[in-house]
């Protein structure tokens, strides 16, 4: 059975959207992992009584002021939180469109039988 052009187009959109959604979810997960690592680093630094910590820079450890490193990490955390929020919004919109396309395709395929 040959599918009408509009149904083929919807199927193609559905597959593309599925791939985009997977990519968004993957990227969001990557940012969430980085976020947790940085939050854990701040938590561990706060346990230390030392005013200096070591920070990885280009494959070497460099001694740095704890307050400066904490401030840098806090800024990075803020940026990552914004990115995660942005990805969550994109994911939500795509998920809605994905569901709409899926329902539309199911209707069309159901009528064709």
From Swiss-Prot:
It comes from the Archaea. GO terms for biological process: chaperone-mediated protein complex assembly; protein folding. GO terms for cellular component: cytoplasm; prefoldin complex. The keyword Chaperone applies. It is found in: Cytoplasm. GO terms for molecular function: protein-folding chaperone binding; unfolded protein binding. InterPro entries: PFD_beta-like (IPR002777), PfdB (IPR012713), Prefoldin (IPR009053). Keywords: Chaperone, Cytoplasm. SUPFAM superfamilies: Prefoldin. Heterohexamer of two alpha and four beta subunits. Belongs to the prefoldin subunit beta family. Molecular chaperone capable of stabilizing a range of proteins. Seems to fulfill an ATP-independent, HSP70-like function in archaeal de novo protein folding. This is Prefoldin subunit beta. It comes from Methanococcus maripaludis (strain DSM 14266 / JCM 13030 / NBRC 101832 / S2 / LL). The lineage of its organism: Archaea, Methanobacteriati, Methanobacteriota, Methanomada group, Methanococci.
